[in-house]
Design a protein with these regions (language model features):
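N-terminal Rossmann NAD(P)H-binding glycine-rich loop of SDR-like oxidoreductase domains
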Residues: 3-23
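Amphipathic terminal alpha-helices
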Residues: 301-309, 313-338
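Substrate-positioning beta->alpha
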Residues: 177-182, 198-220, 228-229
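Mid/C-terminal beta-alpha module of Rossmann-like enzyme folds, strongest
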Residues: 219-286, 323-326
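Conserved C-terminal active-site "lid" loop/helix of NAD(P)H-dependent oxidoreductases
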Residues: 209, 270-313
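NAD(P)H-binding glycine-rich loop region in Rossmannoid oxidoreductase-like domains
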Residues: 50-92, 96, 100
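Catalytic helix-loop patch of NAD(P)-dependent Rossmann-fold dehydrogenases
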Residues: 123-171, 192-195
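Conserved Rossmann-fold NAD(P)-dependent oxidoreductase catalytic core, especially the SDR/UDP-sugar
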Residues: 96-139
Length: 338
């Protein structure tokens, strides 16, 4: 079986491509990092260096030709950027690829969306898939919601292709280039001090990346799923952010650090000033109001639909995920013991 994995050179896509190869599948992988792409070739993947946002409809059809599944992980998930760029990468490119999949008769198209579409600067518990923020928190959330709407439209046009959307929350694990690297940079910049609103007491649903890969496999194999269905995916273990960071940074990586509680209103105001300066200087701010709020407000997701329809249960607990992430980071030189 041949599977197309987009965004395969880092993060979730890299985990997905590696798992598929180890499971004996043929993998066609896309991404913009040619060095990481060469590593995928060494593992046995067919790698195509391609920016999907720039790809023509014909190139998209060539990508999906002879593929039974498409796992669409590619996205712009930066906390900062222009509206047009987010929509070009996250919405328009997704629509092009989804249309190509429909035209070429791909059996399953699994799209990685985001719970950011729920976020509205308030605490929430046990949110189900039907909730929407009245106003999206940033361009990223708005563009990912637009991508979902375009997939629903393709599902009506191409009924022979089943389009499934997954919303994993708070991804961490091997090949992450965003969350943990930024934490390590902050620790180095602030000399071992990690400043968080409320001292990191937010209760969050987080997800170990290989568990999302498991959910993607279930979404591809499970019979009878309605096209256009969407599922929350988490580790089923909501945890205080400070506890997760202590387990990873101190216990696994052996880093000495001090967690400093900063009042949320102060950080929110500071982030707003940084955003204003970033707009004038055209440089990404160190903080955004969204990135501050995301680690301040509690957010947990309902898992009933994923359990009942996908049969999803995490393969790795939070404890196992943190341990495996620590092992990977140590191999990459991401921490020093002692």
């Amino acid at each position: 079986m041949r599977v197309l994995v987009t965004g395969a050179t880092s993060g979730l896509g890299r985990n997905a491509a590696q798992w598929l190869l180890e499971a004996g599948h043929q993998v066609r992988a896309t991404g913009r990092d040619e060095r990481a792409g060469e590593a995928l070739r060494q593992l046995g993947a067919e790698f195509c260096a391609l920016d999907l946002a720039q790809a023509t409809p014909q190139q998209c059809r060539q990508l999906v030709t002879d593929c039974e599944w498409v796992w669409h992980c590619a996205a712009k998930s930066s906390p900062w950027g222009g509206k047009a760029e987010f929509h070009r990468i996250n919405a328009a490119a997704t629509e092009k690829l989804a249309e190509a999949a429909g035209r070429c008769g791909v059996r399953r198209f699994v799209h990685i969306s985001t719970p950011a579409i729920y976020f509205d600067f308030q605490p929430h518990y046990d949110l189900d898939e039907g909730y929407r923020a009245r106003r999206f928190a940033n361009h990223y959330a708005a563009s990912k919601h637009a991508a979902e709407q375009r997939l629903l439209a393709q599902a009506k046009i191409y009924p022979q292709t089943t389009y499934i959307m997954l919303r994993p929350r708070g991804l961490f694990g091997p090949h992450d280039r965003v969350i943990v690297p930024r934490l390590l940079q902050q620790l180095e910049r602030d000399r071992g001090v990690l400043r968080l609103p409320g001292g990191g007491q937010a209760l969050l649903d987080l997800t170990f990346a290989p568990n999302v890969v498991h959910a993607m496999e279930l979404a591809s194999r499970q019979r009878g799923l309605p096209s256009g269905a969407v599922y929350n995916i988490t580790n089923h273990q909501p945890q205080r952010l400070a506890e997760m960071l202590d387990a990873l940074l101190r216990q696994e990586l052996g880093l000495s650090y001090r967690l400093q509680a900063v009042p949320y209103p102060l950080l929110h105001t500071l982030a707003g000033g940084m955003e204003l300066w970033a707009t004038l200087s055209c440089k990404e701010p160190l903080l955004t109001r969204y990135s501050v709020a995301a680690v301040h407000f509690d957010m947990t997701l309902n898992q009933t639909r994923a359990i009942e329809e996908l049969g999803y249960r995490p393969r790795y607990s939070m404890e196992e995920g943190i341990r495996l992430t620590g092992e990977w980071l140590r191999r990459q030189g991401g921490g020093q013991h002692g």
